[in-house]
């Protein structure tokens, strides 16, 4: 299940991180599973999800996803999260363990944006990130009443501190230029029915370039067979 390896997130230097992903053939380019890459395209077979679309809260992609940026998060113990962002802010997230080749992939998840919040002052920011704030409670409820249970630290029956980590986002694989985004995040989820896929809710307070937002994304598991990578 998504999230099992993401409790030990920690930061890594941008140049050091890029070096870890460099191909032997071309040290300026990132190694990446399944040939997912900036400028590449992904068609996702959404039929398995559309069978249950009336229960899903996520917006399913209607068109080919063109990868415009790549993000990297180091988990420690040989684990990395690779994020592939489309222009519409949909995201394919891939977890790899002990390597970055196809055989090292543990999980693939599709996330689509649900809602953005823009805290205007310290008090509003604290509503999300302070102790007992919205990010970290045992449940998260959408405006329509849909409730998600906390997945990270699900063995804790009270508030849990959001997971803090840094993500390095690149728009040019041949350049060291990048954005560093600081996250305070928590993963939630719900079972649609016993025989249906889980739906995830990723809530992240993000700060970068003197900006602060709270991003809520909804996701589902993907199988490699559901993706056509071009």
Residue spans for each PLM region:
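Mixed-charge, low-complexity intrinsically disordered regions
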Residues: 1-63, 70-230
